Every structure is written in structure tokens, then in C-alpha cells.
Design a protein with these regions (language model features):
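DUTPase catalytic domain/fold
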Residues: 1-192
Length: 192
């Protein structure tokens, strides 16, 4: 069996297959992170915008999205996504995989079907030489707000091995073999 070395970040959760027959490992939200800025104190991480522990005081945009959710175990903070909003979340771990293994970050079908929540960078490819925390760009396609919670299972990762072909340049289009399909593209095979 192939091994993947995994470093859990503080507050991160181990990816988990929820059934014996599952191919994908569910991954959970650790933090809301910046898509542009790295953490000034830890260059392997993106800048944390919201950690689900404290209401941020230095970012009015993020602060207006934070809501308090009453729970039996005590109030919890959540991030309220606006309709049509995308938010980048960190999933709490860093991997080391042998080349040519990689993983794809894919949506969880239940979130999409039941809640209208999907991910826009799907599948997001995480290469074996990447040594940062993978991010999931969550998209709310609903006409109403949606709450993101810490440790919410937000996506799944699917480990695979890549085929790395030798690319051979030909001098003309005629050197490529003909097919019955030819240049028929989008929708050419119909929907039935």
C-alpha cells in the first residue's frame, strides 16, 4: 500500500474515509484564509482571516461575516457566507507523497445536493512537491446565506497516480490520425 506522510497543523483534523468502500477522504475546515497573502510569521501557511475562535478586529469585511451560533456545549463562532460568495478555507494538513502520486480536491455530493454548497476549484490538483496547506474555494450558490463551521467536512481528497507521457511535437495537423468524431466538440454526442 502506498504511504502518504501527513503533518496535521494546529487545529487540523485527519482526513477520513467515512465508509470501507469510500475512495475519497473527507477533509474539514480549519480556518478561513487569504487567497493572496501568506502568514507573516509562518511562510508555509496562508494568512488566517478567521480562526473560528475569536472575532477578528482588524478586518471589517471578515468581521461582518462572523456570527455567534448558540449550542448546548456553548456558543460557537461561524462564518456566514453571502449568496454567491466564494471563501477560501484551509483544510489543516500538509502532505508528502512519492512522485507521481497526487490528490484531487473534489466537492462532497451531499453538500452540493442538499445545501447548494460546492467548490469552484474542482478538481483542485495538489502535486507531490507542494508543501503547504491545501485550500478549498467554497462557493455558496444559494439565494440565502450559509454558515461555515470549524471542523465542517467541506470537501474530499482523492489520491491517484499520474501518467506522465512523453510529448512528441508533430510538424503538421495531417500527421495526427483521423477519427470519426473529428473536431466535433461541446455537446456533439447529445444528451440522450
Amino acid at each position: 500500500m502506498d504511504k502518504v506522510r501527513i503533518y496535521l497543523l494546529p487545529g487540523g483534523k485527519m482526513p477520513e474515509r467515512k465508509t470501507k468502500g469510500a475512495i475519497g477522504f473527507d477533509v474539514a475546515i480549519r480556518t478561513v484564509v487569504s487567497s493572496m497573502e501568506m502568514d507573516p510569521t509562518n511562510p508555509i501557511l496562508r494568512k488566517t482571516l478567521f480562526d473560528f475562535i475569536e472575532i477578528p478586529k482588524d478586518n471589517p469585511y471578515i468581521e461582518r461575516h462572523v456570527v455567534i451560533v448558540p449550542r448546548q456545549a456553548g456558543d460557537q463562532l461561524a462564518y456566514q457566507m453571502d449568496p454567491g460568495e466564494s471563501v477560501l478555507v484551509g483544510i489543516g494538513f500538509i502532505t508528502e507523497m512519492e512522485w507521481p502520486m497526487f490528490y484531487w480536491v473534489a466537492p462532497r455530493s451531499g453538500l452540493a445536493a442538499k445545501w447548494g454548497i460546492t467548490i469552484t476549484n474542482a478538481p483542485g490538483t495538489v502535486d507531490p512537491d507542494y508543501r503547504g496547506e491545501a485550500g478549498v474555494l467554497v462557493y455558496n450558490r444559494n439565494p440565502h446565506p450559509f454558515l461555515l463551521h470549524k471542523d465542517m467536512r467541506i470537501a474530499q481528497v482523492i489520491f491517484q497516480e499520474a501518467i506522465i507521457p512523453n510529448l512528441v511535437v508533430v510538424e503538421s495537423y495531417e500527421e495526427l490520425s483521423n477519427t470519426a468524431r473529428g473536431t466535433d466538440g461541446f455537446g456533439s454526442t447529445g444528451i440522450k
